Amino acid sequence: MPMQGAQRKLLGSLNSTPTATSNLGLAANHTGAPCLEVPIPDGLFLSLGLVSLVENVLVVAAIAKNRNLHSSMYCFICCLAVSDLLVSGSNMLETAIILLLEAGALVTRASVVQQLHNTIDVLTCSSMLCSLCFLGAIAVDRYISIFYALRYHSIMTLPRAQRAIAAIWVASVLSSTLFITYYDHAAVLLCLVVFFLAMLVLMAVLYVHMLARACQHAQGIIRLHKRQPPAHKGFGLRGAATLTILLGIFFLCWGPFFLHLTLVVFCPQHMTCSCIFKNFKVFLTLIICNTIIDPLIYAFRSQELRRTLKEVLLCSRWPGCWAEGGGDSVWPGSCVTLRGPLPP
C-alpha cells in the first residue's frame, strides 16, 4: 500500500528514535542470534484496553454521583481514573486505526494520518504523565492525612486540590506537546525517565515513612493493652507486604517502558538493545495492565465507593432511579429512599 509508511508511524514517536529505528535492521543482519520477541495479539491488547475503559468509567461515575465522595482524596482518585481511561483509550484508538488502515477499511491521505499520529501521541503522553502525577498526588494526600491529621482538612481543601489538578493537567499537556515535537532529542527522553524515577522515589519515601508511623502506632497500642510483641511483628510484615505489592506493581508495569526509553538514548545500535526494542508493545500492554490494577488498589478498597458503584450498576436499568443528592437511591415505583447498601 502506498501509505504503509505513514500507517506505521501511528505506532508512536516514543517507540524509538530515528537513529535507533534505522539501526535495528542492521543489528539483526550482522548477528544471527535470535531475539526474544513476545507477540501481543491485537485482540488481547484491545480487550485489556476495553476492561480498563469500563473499570475506570465506573470509578468516575461512582465518584461523580455520590456527594460524600467529593473530597480532595477522591478528586485525585477520580483524575487518576480519567488519566488511566485516556491511556487505555488512546492506545486502543491507535491500534484500531492501524488495523483499519492495514485492512483497507479506512482510506485517507497521508497528511491526515500524520495529524492523527501527532494527536494520539500527545494524548497518550499527556495521559501517561497525568497518571504518574496523580499517583504521586494520592501518595502526598495520604501522607498529609497521617502526619497532619488534625490540620488535614485545612491543608487539603477542595479548592487547593482543584488548583493542583488543573496545574497537573495543563503541565502534562504542555510537556507532552514539547516531548512529542522534539522526541528525537535524547534530552527529551531523559527528562521522561528522570520524571518517572522522581515519582518512584517520592512514592517509596512517603509510603515507607507512613508504614513506619503505622508500626509505631501499632506498637503503642500493644504496649497500652499489654499484648504480646508478635502481634506487632505480624502487623509490620503485613504492612511491608502491602507496600511491596503497591510499589512493585508500579515499577513492574511502568519500569520496562522507561527502560526502553533509556536504552533508546544510550544504546540505540547495541544488539541486545535492538532485541528489547522489538517488545515495545509488551511494555505498552504492561501500562494498560496498570490502568486495570489502579482502580483495584486506590478506588475499590473504599466501602463507600463500592456501595455507590453497586447502586450505579443496579440503578442503570431505570432512568429515574437516583434521588437528588448524595449516594441515596430510590427504587422505581417506590417512595422508599435507601440509605444503606441496596439489597442483592
From Swiss-Prot:
Glycosylated residue positions: N29
Protein's cellular compartments: Cell membrane
Classification of source organism: Eukaryota, Metazoa, Chordata, Craniata, Vertebrata
Gene3D superfamilies noted in UniProt: Rhodopsin 7-helix transmembrane proteins
Family as reported in the entry's similarity comment: Belongs to the G-protein coupled receptor 1 family.
Protein encoded by which gene: MC1R
GO cellular component, one term: plasma membrane
The protein's name in its UniProt record: Melanocyte-stimulating hormone receptor
Subunit field text: Interacts with MGRN1, but does not undergo MGRN1-mediated ubiquitination; this interaction competes with GNAS-binding and thus inhibits agonist-induced cAMP production. Interacts with OPN3; the interaction results in a decrease in MC1R-mediated cAMP signaling and ultimately a decrease in melanin production in melanocytes.
Organism whose genome encodes this protein: Callimico goeldii (Goeldi's marmoset)
The protein's role, per its UniProt record: Receptor for MSH (alpha, beta and gamma) and ACTH. The activity of this receptor is mediated by G proteins which activate adenylate cyclase. Mediates melanogenesis, the production of eumelanin (black/brown) and phaeomelanin (red/yellow), via regulation of cAMP signaling in melanocytes.
